């Protein structure tokens, strides 16, 4: 949208449509981020600036939604907030809605953070990323989200407690640099590689257990 600078990209596949929202980029986007007045939207109170951006392109996005297919809403920073608002607008009418956000700011007014029944709802947070912690006074994340936290010590934690995140938090420089998408990409690749290695270990253990059982069976049969 040329007035709000809101931008979305749509990739259509055979069984899933991916709708990705662009994050903060222009001066208008910054004004959006600081407009924290709550307004009613999607059956709850939401961050007014995010709602303004989302509403400016939502009708265009609706034209591309196919209820017969899975839909993944995703985005980084401001784009993550717009993706979350999209899920809030559609989950009651459409099945198979999925949400993955990166460094997403809080957009639901506290007290109006009703859970959403999505296929999956993941919010990725990279270490000290300050944007993913704000605005804090009036707003919070959806109560049904799963947080994948890329800790500063190199570990990956699912739904860490507030104390853990507070202790893990770095200095001012880290709070800025950890918000960059490049950092998220690096940590995601690391996480997926660790999952791949872990899956191989499980497969190897199962194969070893099977081989051990077959050896025992052969010995019993021969005795």
Language-model-derived ranges and their functions:
Residues 1-74, 78-223:
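Non-catalytic, mobile gating and regulatory segments of ester bond hydrolases
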